[in-house]
Amino acid sequence: MVPEYSRFYNILGYNFKDYTLLIRALTHRSKTKKNYERLEFLGDSVLSFVIAEVLYKQFTDLAEGKLSQLRSKLVKGTTLAQLASSLKMDEYIILGASEQGGHKREKILEDVFEAVIGAIYLDSDFATVKKVILKWYQPIISSINLDTIKFKDSKSKLQEILLQNALSLPEYSIETIDGKDHEQQFTVVAVSKDLNLRVKAQGTSRKKAEQKTAEKMIEMLSQQGLHEKK
């Protein structure tokens, strides 16, 4: 164990075998090309899967759309930044001169949180990183009360995100209708001219296909840093 990180290891609840992975996860691109961005990409996927799995198992009667919305609440930037701060990650972030003072910035905290997850995964295995993530999230997950959560359908949520960012609403159109009358499959396309996005999805009705298309577009917007503002 590297002495200066022993306290941090205790806070994280994980001891790195290869501490250089942790260093990389804490290093902002303003410092060096060997930064956390690739680990952040990996950690984002690992976190999303772990949270999706625990919600699927815990809320057995919750429909797909609501599970997706609940997951979004748990992995949104504000939540990740708060968790990063509670784990004292801000005290260990390595920044270049141009970013000094950025330790408390929400976007940097969010990115580092995901990068540390990616680093733990590479340093161990999926079972281990899952255990660590669930320990960090335990207070949040145990306090979920579905009766107090306001769920929105995906089209409404997408509309709100776009309007909050002064963007025009998408245009939905049916591309194809396949199958017999009693088992039709609708393919719907949604186009956002402002963002130059074109997304398609299928469903057993036009309404379901449009909702799935909206879900896909929300995910794409999230990757670009556009989230619903609270």
From Swiss-Prot:
Residues 5-125 form the RNase III domain. Pfam families: dsrm, Ribonucleas_3_3. PROSITE patterns: DS_RBD, RNASE_3_1, RNASE_3_2. Its EC number is 3.1.26.3. Keywords: Cytoplasm, Endonuclease, Hydrolase, Magnesium, Metal-binding, mRNA processing, Nuclease, RNA-binding, rRNA processing, rRNA-binding, tRNA processing. It catalyses: Endonucleolytic cleavage to 5'-phosphomonoester. Residues 153-223 form the DRBM domain. One of its GO terms (biological process) is mRNA processing. It is found in: Cytoplasm. It comes from the Bacteria. GO terms for cellular component: cytoplasm. Its main location: cytoplasm. Mg(2+) binds at E40, D111, E114. Homodimer. Belongs to the ribonuclease III family. This is Ribonuclease 3. It comes from Francisella tularensis subsp. holarctica (strain OSU18). The gene is rnc.
